[in-house]
Curated annotation (Swiss-Prot):
Composition-biased stretches (Polar residues): 50-66, 328-337
The species this protein was found in: Xenopus tropicalis (Western clawed frog)
Protein name: E3 ubiquitin-protein ligase arkadia
Lineage of the organism: Eukaryota, Metazoa, Chordata, Craniata, Vertebrata
Catalytic activity entry: S-ubiquitinyl-[E2 ubiquitin-conjugating enzyme]-L-cysteine + [acceptor protein]-L-lysine = [E2 ubiquitin-conjugating enzyme]-L-cysteine + N(6)-ubiquitinyl-[acceptor protein]-L-lysine
Motif SUMO interaction motif 2 (SIM), residue numbers: 305-311
Motif position, SUMO interaction motif 3 (SIM): 360-364
Record family assignment: Belongs to the Arkadia family.
Length: 954
């Protein structure tokens, strides 16, 4: 290896520059996407000072030998790198330590330590190394390739051979020793390598292709050997191998890149994912630019390679745009964008297939909370498998491969105890979608998804932010302890269904730190195949309720989890049901994983998790929103009412609702049958019939109250009512027709006070009543207890005559009426009296006001319609005329006849008094008539309305 690498790095650099200066080659190769170009330019600008020629010269002189060796080793890593970026980080950390020590370790040590990285296709050490290596390699290659591609071939071949197979200890040891030089090499000519590679990439020979094939075979053999050691490696390893082979050899061009000048190119590709990670560990600044250059180069390479690069780009691009790899840095803030987290997580998702569980633990270190999540090897395996396939192959193959891994996963998962069966798949899917939507994710990913509180170690947020995940599936990793068994196969949701969905970060943390970031914004097009739309942003990877069992093939309850951290104490933690994947694989997966991966379902989950995981209904799906019973029952599983209640599991209540905390033991295998609303009797145990944990839409089925119990309750109510005689006599006499269920609703509930305020004792108290006391609003109508209460509204004496059969009929008829809401809101006398009394008083006042408006006149109306003036006695002529007439009539005219009186006060009108003449010409004192008109607009004498027009003669 060393002998092949020439020590005159500066010369190589010069050669490389010469190649780069070749405009034709550059133009020809310059086919990479705008994104990459932008990133490359940005990186070059940012890091120009770091990568200045003088610095490069010095670095070259200082680390020629080490870099050269490193370059060879990098090939090896680079190959690994194709598989995935995630594992690289852990390997980088390990190897960086060695590098810092700069101690030449024995070949065996190096091989073993590096074997992890090498063994896993995604080992990240190659990333950082590849970056370094590529730059060095570029130096070597320019000499070899620019003169002739042939020279490069032997070297590249040897490099390739070492690159993948661990057996080459030389490369490993040299690589380990050389690692310290990463900084120099990585900083060095980020862009040069790209261009040069482009020129070289065109040079491909049949020999190179053959070498690629051989190399591929070797890798497969190694992979099989590695997987033979893993517990459930059989299926996943095959998938991994196939995906691996596809990634490495999906296009011969890719292999050519390895073998030939393309090799540098390949390195560049690897670099974006791995170089970033490792370099960042060593030199954050340099790593980003390197990544950019590498990404560009990758783009120019063949399709499969580009895809791989795309994965890297997605991670990288996010990071490249400004986030130096902080995956290992604990200084990273929880607020860092999800892009960053997603990238890191994704790399984790891409974890090497060959990695052991302990190694995986290292990888899962979370940026924000470095708690290491020991993920079992099984999880890792399946994850890398699907990931590799998704990354390597085009989006279509990705979905296929993903499905394959899922299937294999189903078998493998049982062996893996607490690992959510689908989380890895999700991660892979996430990778897949990420590859397809790298451009989208580059600029900004959805904010990092909140991590579940550490109190719920079992709820490790799902490792994968699959496209489906983005939809807000409670992450499968969250499944565990919560009693609601719904293995989320949502991970199995069609991987390809949401290519454009920003992937939610795949959380591996089993510790569920409570620091929840903003929920991932629903991806625009990301609707699970089930057709359920993205749930609220709140749909954070929440409850692990195993939806798999419950899942209706077509109904995807995206559980929007009202995302309360599932701290043991927080009863509010709502888990949402992960959307049920419609894919059959998911179904079987969920069931298989159910036994093994789900926390022992047979044993009732500890009450604490139960209380914490209260499932709220998904708002969009609740056709009959009944938030009530959710709060009511301790751990009510909000069945999003998608048209059917999924009463998958009987929930026998262990405690008679001493508190809202739910402590219902979950029967080990929750029945997977889904009852539709129409015929889903809510399982109200007879003893707790009043506790309508899940209120089914059909009242009759729900009502399981025995006749004698109903009669007893009625009697109790009647007695209570009799204790309040004032209320009793206030009730209108019961009318027989009112007993009919169809009687005009609301009329028979005249006096709500019948419901006495005495709290019911023990079993009498229904769940919704308890909810009412706790201030929870009740469902629009409660089937079971409600009937008896409705009966109570009828006249007490006749209650015992009410036939039980009629009661269920009442509910459907009354469902839409407001009084039902009052009843459901609280049948305790206390709750009812206040609202009803207030309403009655308001009605009285309203009636009075309306009466005033209808009968009385405002002062303005009075002034407008009447004629106020000073009273004047009629002229003598008029009196004389009257006297004459009266005399003629034989009557004596007296003075009294000539005087006018106010008919209201019956006093004679005096000269100069304020009087008001109404349109009817009647005259009154202003004071007297105004008081009258305020209450009645009509004349007190003739009852003519003052609004009428005055006669013209007046």
């Amino acid at each position: 290896m060393k002998s092949e690498v020439s020590s005159d790095a500066p010369k190589r650099q010069e050669n490389l520059k010469g190649v780069l200066l070749n405009p034709e080659a550059i133009g020809a190769s310059k086919s990479f996407p705008k994104e990459v170009e932008m990133i490359a330019s940005k990186v070059s600008n940012e890091f120009s000072h770091l990568c200045s020629d003088t610095n490069k010269q010095q670095r070259d002189l200082n680390s020629n030998g080490t870099e050269q060796e490193k370059n060879l080793v990098v090939h090896k890593k680079r190959k690994n790198q194709q598989a995935g970026t995630s594992y690289a980080q852990s390997c980088e950390v390990k190897e960086n330590q060695r590098l810092l020590r700069l101690q030449p370790q024995s070949d065996e040590d190096n091989d073993s330590s590096f074997s992890d990285c090498i063994s896993s296709p995604s080992s990240s050490s190659h990333f950082g190394d590849s970056d370094t290596m590529t730059s060095d390699e570029d130096k070597d290659n320019p000499r070899r390739y620019s003169p002739a591609g042939v020279n490069a071939t032997p070297r590249t071949q040897s490099a390739r051979a070492q690159k993948w197979p661990r057996p080459h200890t030389d490369s490993v040891s040299s690589l380990v020793m050389k690692r310290p030089c990463y900084q120099v090499s990585s900083l060095r000519r980020p862009l040069h390598r790209k261009r040069f590679v482009k020129n070289v990439s065109s040079q491909r020979t049949q020999k190179q292709k053959e070498r690629m094939m051989l190399q591929r075979k070797k890798r497969e053999v190694l992979a099989r050997q590695k997987y033979a050691l893993l517990p459930s490696s059989s299926s996943s390893s095959e998938n991994d191998l196939s995906s691996e082979s596809s990634s490495s050899s999906s296009t011969e061009g890719e292999e050519d890149l390895f073998v030939s000048p393309g090799e540098n190119h390949q390195d560049g590709t690897t670099l974006p994912s791995g170089g970033m990670d490792e370099d960042v560990v060593v030199i954050e600044a340099s790593s980003t630019p390197q990544v950019t250059a590498n990404e560009e180069i990758n783009v120019t390479s063949t399709d499969s390679e580009v895809e791989i690069v795309t994965v890297g780009e997605t991670y990288r691009s996010r990071t490249t745009l400004g986030h130096p790899r902080s995956h290992w840095g604990q200084n990273t803030q929880s607020g860092r964008t999800q892009e960053q987290r997603t990238r890191n997580r994704v790399s984790t998702v891409i974890q090497p297939l060959r990695q052991n569980t302990t190694e995986v633990v290292d990888l899962t270190v979370d940026e924000d909370d470095p708690t290491v999540v020991p993920t079992t090897s099984g999880r890792v395996e399946s994850q890398p498998v699907s990931t590799v396939s998704s990354n390597t192959s085009t989006s279509e193959p990705a979905s296929d491969s993903a499905s394959g891994p899922l299937g294999s996963r189903g078998s493998a998962i049982p062996e893996i105890p607490p690992i959510p069966p689908n989380s890895n798949t999700v991660g892979t899917i996430a990778d897949d979608s990420r590859t397809s939507t790298s451009g989208t994710n580059v600029d900004g990913g959805p904010p990092a998804m909140p991590r579940l509180p550490s109190c719920c170690p079992q709820h490790s947020p799902c490792g994968g932010s699959s496209q489906n995940h983005v939809l807000g599936h409670p992450h499968s990793s969250c499944f565990p302890p919560h009693s609601h068994h719904f293995p989320h196969h949502h991970h199995h949701h069609h991987q390809s269904s949401h290519p454009g969905v920003p992937l939610s970060p795949s959380f591996r943390d089993s510790h569920c730190p409570v620091e929840r970031n903003a929920a991932v914004p629903p991806p625009c097009g990301a609707t699970s195949s089930s057709g359920s739309t993205y749930h609220d942003p709140q749909a954070l990877p929440v409850d692990l309720s195993n939806n798999g069992i419950r899942s209706h093939g077509s109904v995807s309850f995206h559980s929007t989890s009202a995302f309360d951290p599932c701290c043991p104490g927080s009863s509010s933690r709502s888990t949402v049901y992960g959307h049920q994947s419609t894919t059959s694989t998911a179904q079987t997966m969920a069931i298989d994983g159910y036994g093994s991966s789900m926390v022992a379902q047979a044993q009732p989950p500890p009450p604490t998790p139960l209380s914490s995981c209260r499932h709220y209904m998904h708002a969009p799906y609740t056709s009959l929103t009944r938030p009530l019973h959710h709060q009511t029952s301790s751990c009510p599983h909000s069945h999003s009412n998608v048209g059917d209640y999924v009463i998958a599991h009987q929930v026998p209540f262990i405690s008679p609702l001493p508190s809202l905390a739910a402590t219902h033991a979950v029967p080990p295998p929750p029945p997977s049958h889904h009852l539709s609303t129409a015929a889903a009797p809510q399982h109200l145990s007879t003893s707790h019939q009043s506790m309508s944990h899940h209120i089914s839409a059909t009242a009759p089925a729900t009502q399981r109250l025995h006749t004698h119990e109903v009669i007893q309750r009625m009697e109790v109510q009647r007695r209570r009512m009799m204790q309040h005689p004032t209320r009793a006599h206030e009730r209108p006499p019961p009318h027989p027709h009112r007993m009919h269920p169809n009687y005009g609703h609301g009329h028979h509930i005249h006096v709500p006070q019948t419901m006495s305020s005495h709290p019911r004792q023990g079993p009498e108290r229904s769940a919704w009543e308890i909810a009412i006391e706790t201030g929870v609003t009740a469902a629009p109508y409660q089937t079971g207890p409600l009937h008896t209460h409705l009966a109570h509204y009828h006249a007490p004496p006749r209650l015992h005559h009410l036939q039980i059969g009629a009661l269920p009929l009442m509910v459907p008829d009354m469902a839409g009426y407001p009084h039902i809401r009052y009843i459901s809101s609280g049948l305790d006398g206390r709750s009812f009296r206040v609202p009803f009394r207030g309403n009655f008083e308001e009605l009285i006042h309203l009636e009075e006001r309306l009466g005033n408006v209808n009968r009385g006149a405002s002062q303005g109306t009075i002034e407008r319609c009447t004629y106020p003036h000073k009273y004047e006695k009629v002229s003598t002529d008029w009196f004389s005329q009257r006297k004459l007439h009266s005399k003629q009539d034989g009557e004596e005219a007296t003075e009294e006849d000539t005087e006018e009186k106010c008919t209201i006060c019956l006093s004679i009108l005096e000269e100069g008094e304020d009087v008001r003449r109404l349109p009817c010409m009647h005259l009154f004192h202003q004071v007297c008539v105004d008081q009258w008109l305020i209450t009645n607009k009509k004349c007190p004498i003739c009852r003519v309305d003052i609004d009428t027009q005055l006669p013209t003669e007046s």
